Regions:
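Lipid interaction determinants
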Residues: 19-142
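Positively charged n-region of N-terminal signal peptides that target proteins for export
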Residues: 1-4
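Bacterial N-terminal signal peptides
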Residues: 8-17
Length: 142
């Protein structure tokens, strides 16, 4: 059972982080001026093979809120500095509703990626979250 859960988690993580790559320094926008993320809803891009549709939005006064795929997620411990694209979300709170295991796996991996990200890049209507130069996840402006 643990083996199946582990394999499923890896598969879901792979789906969520599809197109993950290390960006070449010459073409990188990482560390450069970025637009504000405030008052915009950002939804995960990709075929999740589940009904889960994780999203986040940011408000200067209330922090981050959204949905991890099943449960509401939120944090007031948010640092977003558009000057260099610095990004940090810590202490994410999660409601605890009963959800299908596939949706819970998506949610767990989504929250882990949000808490791991330390840089962001906005390219047109796409928000890319990075840990260093490694792309973790892409979200679309909704």
């Amino acid at each position: 059972m643990k083996k199946i859960f582990y394999i499923t988690s890896i598969g879901i993580f792979s789906i969520l982080s599809s197109c993950s790559s290390v960006v070449g320094v010459g073409e990188s926008k990482i560390g450069k001026q970025q637009p504000s993320l405030s008052n915009t809803r950002w939804e995960v891009i990709g075929n999740l093979k589940t009904n889960a549709r994780p999203y986040i939005s940011f408000d200067p006064e209330t922090g981050m809120n959204g949905n991890g795929g099943c449960n509401r997620i939120f944090s007031q411990n948010v640092i977003i500095k558009s000057q260099h694209g610095d990004f940090s979300i810590k202490n994410i709170g999660i409601t605890r509703m009963a959800c299908p295991s596939m949706d819970m796996n998506v949610e767990t991996n989504f929250v882990k990626m949000l808490e791991s990200a330390n840089k962001y890049v906005v390219d047109k209507n796409t928000l890319e979250l990075y840990k260093g130069n490694m792309l973790l996840i892409k979200l679309h402006k909704n």
